From Swiss-Prot:
Residues 1-15, 67-72, 153-155, 224-232 are mitochondrial matrix. This is Cytochrome c oxidase subunit 3. GO terms for molecular function: cytochrome-c oxidase activity. The keyword Membrane applies. The keyword Translocase applies. It catalyses: 4 Fe(II)-[cytochrome c] + O2 + 8 H(+)(in) = 4 Fe(III)-[cytochrome c] + 2 H2O + 4 H(+)(out). It is an enzyme of class 7 (translocase). It is found in: Mitochondrion inner membrane. The lineage of its organism: Eukaryota, Metazoa, Chordata, Craniata, Vertebrata. The chain crosses the membrane at residues 16-34, 41-66, 73-105, 129-152, 156-183, 191-223, 233-256. GO terms for cellular component: mitochondrial inner membrane; respiratory chain complex IV. Residues 35-40, 106-128, 184-190, 257-261 are mitochondrial intermembrane.
Length: 261
């Protein structure tokens, strides 16, 4: 972006939306190729181009905001509205999965044996790994709030410590979820119980990985002194997203693990 004399969010033409769309096409096509023909070539190509696009797009945004000063108060306000709308769209996305779950579980059909969980399904014990996962995510919610308050108070060391703890808890959650999937006595193909369980918890797990990536980027940016107490929207957006992931898990735990078992 060349020199600008206004306070609004008008960026230069960028190739990244196009390469991002093409990488998404490659990933979805690659997923189909993997499922039907057991070939991962297209999927790997899609993932690689997607990672490259994300890296270069975020690099441009960081340059515009941190080094060129284009993220004026007006621009930050617009970005906040954008992030709020994005989180609302994610809430609606998960509402669809909860709707599918309750539609199937509140009035089980004769094919399911007229009961929930369906006949033949051994559900996971909600007081074992799922409860540990809940406490891990709740603890990460506390540590991200600690990081946010430390940043606003200008305490860089505490902010980095709290952010590192949050990332570690996010990675721990992902490992626990992976071990739970590995040991689960049912699969995604075990009727409506398996499909609603794995799709809802799997998409949540994907969001935890995305949120952890977001926080890792913030961690490295803070190591380079990118955030100040009054200019840190990148971190704020990551914190909002992490709280959203936290709340969704509480609903998943109460609905699918505890009530649904």
């Amino acid at each position: 972006m060349t020199h600008q004399t206004h306070a609004y969010h008008m960026v230069n033409p960028s190739p990244w939306p196009l390469t991002g769309a093409l990488s998404a096409l490659l990933m979805t096509s690659g997923l189909i190729m993997w499922f039907h023909f057991n070939s991962t070539t297209l999927l790997m190509l899609g993932l690689t181009t997607n990672m490259l696009t994300m890296y270069q797009w975020w690099r441009d945004v960081i340059r515009e905001s941190t080094f060129q000063g284009h993220h004026t108060p007006n621009v930050q306000k617009g970005l906040r509205y954008g992030m709020i709308l994005f989180i609302i769209s994610e809430v609606l996305f998960f509402t669809g999965f909860f709707w599918a779950f309750y539609h199937s579980s509140l009035a089980p059909t004769p094919e399911l044996g007229g009961c929930w969980p369906p006949t033949g399904i051994n559900p996971l014990n909600p007081l074992e790994v799922p409860l540990l996962n809940t406490s891990v995510l709740l603890a990460s919610g506390v540590s991200i709030t600690w990081a946010h308050h430390s940043l606003m108070e200008g305490n860089r060391n505490h902010m980095l410590q709290a952010l590192f703890i949050t990332i570690a808890l996010g990675v721990y959650f992902t490992l626990l979820q992976a071990s739970e999937y590995y040991e689960a006595p049912f699969t995604i193909s075990d009727g409506v119980y398996g499909s609603t369980f794995f799709v809802a918890t799997g998409f949540h797990g994907l969001h935890v990985i995305i949120g952890s990536t977001f926080l890792i980027v913030c961690f490295f940016r803070q190591l380079k002194f990118h955030f100040t107490s009054n200019h840190h929207f990148g971190f704020e957006a990551a914190a909002w997203y992490w709280h959203f992931v936290d709340v969704v898990w509480l609903f998943l735990y109460v609905s699918i693990y505890w009530w649904g078992s």
